[in-house]
Amino acid sequence: MKIKELRLLNITIKQNDQILFQGKTEEIPPNLKEMEYEKIYFEGVDVIVEIN
């Protein structure tokens, strides 16, 4: 599933423990929206998405 298909408000996208994006799903940069995620989980009220 691609990241752009997520419909949640607060999201953090990480790659190798480095944060690539943190904010609202609607504001994700186009290059990240097309990436597929490896792992997704909740941390508090935020959704954490890990990519390769």
Regions found by a protein language model. Name each.
Residues M1-K4, K24:
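Short, structural beta-strand-to-alpha-helix junction motif
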Residues L9, Q15-N52:
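Detector for the mature cores of small, proteolytically processed
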